[in-house]
Design a protein with these regions (language model features):
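Small-residue (G/A/S/T)-rich helix-start motifs and N-terminal tracts that mark the onset
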Residues: 1-161, 169-186, 191-350
Length: 350
């Protein structure tokens, strides 16, 4: 495999050059990310660019849901709907601007009632789901997660789902959860969530080492999980690893301590959900989502430094990253390097 130069923005060359296995492990860079961008047809409408359903948030973690929704919008989703417990719908409806809200039925102790909630979710028009950020822990949430993974939409292929936070913690208690899942999934655990997941879900450790700092151990463990579960695993942290069931493992070049703050993972979930809704498969959506998120973090760090960055600082930089990637994609089209545009194979345009 030829050596790949890491991300532009002038920041990651040294880190990649010093990585002992850089020639053997694909590293995300601006050219690779640009090739993954979903189409944006000039005559597209809201439905063209995908509908995201975020099942997120609770009274204690309202911010997680708001971050998911804003990130999904900034990553290009045409429509975003936030599904929340019905007693909290007025609170969230007053906070979101571009997103709409949907009430999920509750039981008599104001927990989400899984069965009628699943019926309402499946009746909703969506192209991708983000499940977990800020959900209230408990048996009701665990059952909601189990049922959603196991129950397809009636009239379409099962919508893909991004699983984060409380969804992952619930799955760790479900044993071999993947055997009952009918949906394409992208799991986005941090190392602690990943350890709980693989301990409860029959994944051999695969490698000794620190899953926060040992790149070899992180790649080996993430790949073992992805191949056991049959779903994409995004093992977050410095130099995030994206592992796919087909054996593809990609390492992100980002090492930004400014992202070590609450809510940045919720932003990532929203970005990946938006890319799934725009038609990308789980692997490409995860790779491009990690790239957009990490580069947005670098842009914010350039302005603010590596301390004091807030998760809410990230979404507004995502369109700037995408705009740059569009330029990269244009420059890499056939004929561009020669200074002309090829039309219908007839040679240089006038």
């Amino acid at each position: 495999m030829p050596e790949r130069r890491p991300l532009g923005f002038g920041r990651h060359e040294a880190a990649a050059a010093s990585a002992k296995d850089a020639p053997a492990v694909p590293t995300l860079d601006d050219k690779a990310a640009a090739a993954l961008l979903p189409e944006r047809p000039p005559r597209g409408h809201k439905g063209t660019f995908g509908k995201v359903l975020a099942i997120a948030g609770s009274l204690d973690y309202a911010g997680a849901a708001l971050l998911v929704c804003r990130a999904a919008g900034r990553a290009g989703a045409g429509l975003v709907t936030l599904a929340v417990p019905e007693s909290l719908q007025p609170l969230f409806a007053a906070k979101v601007v571009e997103a709409t809200t949907m009430a999920l039925p509750e039981d008599d102790v104001e927990e989400v009632d899984p069965e009628p909630s699943i019926a309402r979710i499946l009746d909703h028009d969506h192209d991708a789901i983000v499940l977990g950020p800020g959900l209230r822990p408990g048996l009701a949430t665990t059952e909601l997660v189990r049922m959603l993974l196991a129950t397809p939409e009636d009239d379409a292929a099962p919508a893909p789902v991004v699983l984060d936070a409380e969804a992952l913690r619930s799955m760790a208690t479900l044993g071999e959860w993947w055997t009952g899942s009918v949906r394409p999934c992208v799991l986005t655990p941090h190392p602690g969530e990943f350890e709980r997941l693989r301990t409860g879900a029959g994944v051999e450790a695969g490698a000794d080492g620190d899953l926060s700092g040992d790149d070899d151990a992180r790649r080996t463990a993430a790949l073992a999980a992805a191949q056991t579960w049959g779903h994409v695993v995004v093992l977050k942290g410095a130099r995030t690893v994206i592992a796919e069931p087909d054996g593809t493992v990609t390492t992100a070049p980002f090492e930004n301590p400014g992202l070590a703050t609450g809510g940045t993972g919720d932003v990532l979930s929203g970005v990946i959900g938006a890319l799934l809704a725009q038609g990308l498969a789980p692997g490409p959506a995860a790779r491009l989502g990690v790239f957009l998120h990490g580069t947005a973090g670098d842009l914010v760090r350039d302005r603010l430094g590596d301390a004091g960055l807030l998760a809410s600082d990230l979404p507004d930089s995502i369109p700037l990253v995408r705009k740059r990637l569009v330029g990269v994609a244009e420059r890499n089209k056939p004929g561009k390097r020669l200074g002309f545009t090829v039309r219908n194979g007839d040679g240089p345009a006038a």
